Amino acid sequence: MKKADILVLDFGSQYTQLIARRLREQGVYAEILPFNVSLDEIKAKEPKGIILSGGPASVYANDAYFCDKGVFDLNIPVLGICYGMQLMAHHFGANVAPAGHKEYGKATIDIQNDSDLFKNLPKKQTVWMSHSDKVENLPQGFEVLATSENSPFCVFGDEKRKFFALQFHPEVQHSEFGKSILKNFAKYACNCDSVWNMGSFAKTQAQKIKEEVGNDKVLCAVSGGVDSSVVAALLASAIKDQVVVVFVDNGLLRSGEKEQVEYMFKHTLGIDLISIDAREIFLSRLAGVRDPEQKRKIIGNTFIEVFEEEAKKHKDVKYLAQGTLYTDIIESSVVGASKTIKSHHNVGGLPEKMNLKLIEPLKEIFKDEVRALGMELGLSKDVVYRHPFPGPGLAIRIMGEVNEPSLELLRKADVILIEELKSSGWYDKTWQAFCVLLNVQSVGVMGDNRTYDNAVCVRVVNASDGMTATFSHLPYELLENISRRIINEVNGINRVVYDISSKPPATIEWE
């Protein structure tokens, strides 16, 4: 079992993943586990510290979430955040009740006492609050470390036992010194070394791959995106002669994608590629299907069928490698009190019975860590920093039924969007950009004629790891050019809208 420097117990906060991400950014390996994980499993991870995340519940309610009480008897530091703070207060005998004044948004805290948490940090800080309950009295054995206008016990702690509790969220960017607070907890309270990096990860994973695979061969599914490209490069670095790299044209690709992928693997990566034309089978199975979850399941099942059929042609192929990321695992599973957001075709979309064993060497890392790993493995910047493209492809960018006419419309619009972003210098400034074909027609006028055609949505976002994202504030002139070109050059589209939703509450992809 892989060890973790810091374990984050998830009580359902939308920000839980950010806690792990902020620690990893500073070289500390953090892992997320459900709040009700057994004490034995926690001990097996040999953590140097534990963080209790925020969450939507109230500790005094009948449906409150509680971790094993033994967490506080492990003689290791514990940090409670928001709900985790209230849980700690409740555990040690303090009273938690509904707050007369709810706090959502920015607040100012004043540091009252010296603490490892605030070492080398200003006495007054802006933080991000998101709570409707309050701690009414200080737990026995703790002291107040910081206060805010609405919370006299905003931060409290026990320096001797290294137990700390924060009412605010240090993991979000709005808490100006939040990242430093988490670093201080890891460094000074937990004595963690900042040794987690992609160089060490690459060596460790290569060795694990060799040990797991042995003399068998691995079928590596690639899409041309950064995730699968990095998986292929990592496998090649570990067991090059045992890797069979397969690209499936499922008919759901962007314009020119197949040719780009074939060129990249042959000339940029130097890896032989088997290309399979499976357009007909994918599109026939998707015919008439409108539900996004059903689309994902169909695509996942069909991919496996195609790969298993190909595996039969290659002696000793026993494994299927995929570019599943930590974010995929989180969004496709119920972690702690968190809810399943959507299944991913390479996680929740897999059939229960699969004749190939699954190997997912990237499942412990976030997207930006994948990019860093790609650079570590010697991939080109063009490959590493290409915008993400979902495994189900354009199927989840078409609202409703997927068919060839809709795919062609979407491809043409998408080409124009990317051309405009690149020519204006905005492509490299954004995390992801794509068009969504809406299941909506609208009235328009072109020349002297009435039109009743499709509407397309342009989605461009900024992000660092894909767990959260904000819409890109593109210049109006650029948006106007994108809209004008799509409407004028793509017959069948007469309206373009721009998605200004952030994640959360929206996801990056529409389906």
From Swiss-Prot:
Q: Which reaction does it catalyse?
A: XMP + L-glutamine + ATP + H2O = GMP + L-glutamate + AMP + diphosphate + 2 H(+)
Report which superkingdom the organism of origin falls in.
Bacteria
Q: Which Pfam families match?
A: GATase, GMP_synt_C, NAD_synthase
Record bears the keyword Ligase? yes
Family matches, as SUPFAM superfamilies: Adenine nucleotide alpha hydrolases-like (SSF52402), Class I glutamine amidotransferase-like (SSF52317), GMP synthetase C-terminal dimerisation domain (SSF54810)
PROSITE patterns (alphabetical) = GATASE_TYPE_1, GMPS_ATP_PPASE
Q: How does it assemble?
A: Homodimer.
Matches recorded under PANTHER family: GMP SYNTHASE [GLUTAMINE-HYDROLYZING] (PTHR11922:SF2), GMP SYNTHASE-RELATED (PTHR11922)
Identification of the protein by name = GMP synthase [glutamine-hydrolyzing]
Organism source for this protein?
A: Campylobacter lari (strain RM2100 / D67 / ATCC BAA-1060)
Q: Which gene encodes it?
A: guaA
